[in-house]
């Protein structure tokens, strides 16, 4: 199994990245192949709502049609990932913009507008989301984090 870690933090050596690296170490010790992607190293944008991914029978059906620094990452996840762990610090009560843009491109393209909803992603993969924030534990509890 291949586990991809997606670091949505601008910092490669701080809390979020350290926790992702530890998760990868644990997975590797159990025999998994691992890879970490630092989103801030990539030149990409969020979804532009071009809807090329929704064109039934089109060359991009189910896949993001945008071509930029995120394209090879999305392709590797689609073709190789058995699991995906995403990590982001909380900035201004939310995930980073880079993580949001990554999720838009990863999740919107394969979704089919049907009842019931379905996905064109080739298989189910295990996922986890890891959040870090610089706030005391009682404040996090108080605000429902």
Model-identified regions with their sequence ranges:
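Short, glycine-/small-residue-rich phosphate/pyrophosphate-handling segment
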Residues: 98, 111-145
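N-terminal beta1-alpha1-beta2 submodule of the flavodoxin-like/Rossmannoid cofactor-binding fold
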Residues: 1-111, 115
């Amino acid at each position: 199994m291949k586990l991809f870690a997606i670091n949505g933090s601008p910092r490669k050596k701080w809390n979020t990245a350290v926790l992702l690296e530890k998760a990868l170490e644990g997975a590797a010790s159990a025999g998994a192949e691992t890879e970490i992607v630092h989103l801030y190293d990539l030149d990409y944008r969020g979804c532009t709502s071009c809807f090329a991914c929704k064109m039934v029978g089109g060359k991009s059906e189910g896949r993001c049609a945008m071509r930029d620094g995120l394209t090879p990452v999305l392709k590797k996840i689609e073709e190789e990932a058995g699991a995906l762990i995403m990590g982001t610090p909380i900035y201004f009560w939310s995930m980073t913009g880079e993580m949001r843009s990554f999720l838009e491109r990863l999740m919107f393209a394969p979704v089919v507008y049907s009842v019931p909803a379905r996905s064109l992603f080739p298989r189910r993969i295990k996922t986890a989301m890891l959040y870090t924030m610089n706030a005391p534990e009682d404040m996090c509890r108080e605000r429902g984090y």
